[in-house]
Amino acid sequence: AMRFLEDVLAEVMDIFPSEYIHIGGDECPKTRWEQCPKCQAKIKELGLKDDAHFTAENYLQSYVMTRMEKFVEDHGRKVIGWDEVLEGGLGPKVTVMSWRSVDGGREGAKQHHDVIMTPCSHLYFDYYQTDNTDDEPIAIGGYIPVSRVYEFEPIPSELTEEEAKHILGAQANLWVEYIKDMNTAFYRVLPRMD
C-alpha cells in the first residue's frame, strides 16, 4: 500500500509543478481499520496503542501520513492535509486545511503549523445560499447565506499574535458532485465569492 501511495504521489508531482501537494487525510474510515486484520497487524508491529487522546487507528493514519509527508518533502515539495491529520500527530512542516470547523485551524496554529481556513460552516459553496430550497438546484445540504460568508474571520481572536501568523488565509470550496453544469456552479459561487 505504501509503495502504491508513493507511486501515485510521484506521478502527481511529475504532472503538477506546484510548491504544495495536498495529500488529503480526511474522512478516513477508521472503524473499518478496527476490523481489518492487516491494519491490526500493522498496529501491533508498530506498537501503537490507544491513549487518552487518540486511538491506535488514529496513530496508524498518522504513521501513513508522516511517511507520505517525508516522501513528498524528499521531492522538494510541501504537504497540505485536511484537519484530520492533527489526530495522532503530524510532521512539523505540514500545512493544515481546517474544513470541519475553525477548531482544527486553531489547534494547528497553536501547534505552529501553517493553516488555511476553509470551514464548511462558512465557506462550502456547494451548500444552499437560501433557506427556501423549493426552487433551488439540488445541493449536498446545509445553508450558507452571503452574510455568513462575509462575516467569516479566518484568524480566531483567541490566538496569540505569534500563533495568528500561522493562519495563511481562507479558501472557499465548491464540491461538484451535485453541480449539473457551469451555470449552477456560477450560481453557487456568486455572489458569495464576490
Residue spans for each PLM region:
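Substrate-binding cleft of carbohydrate-active enzyme catalytic domains
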Residues: A1-R77
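Flexible, acidic glycine-rich loops studded with aromatic residues
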Residues: K78-V94, S98-D194
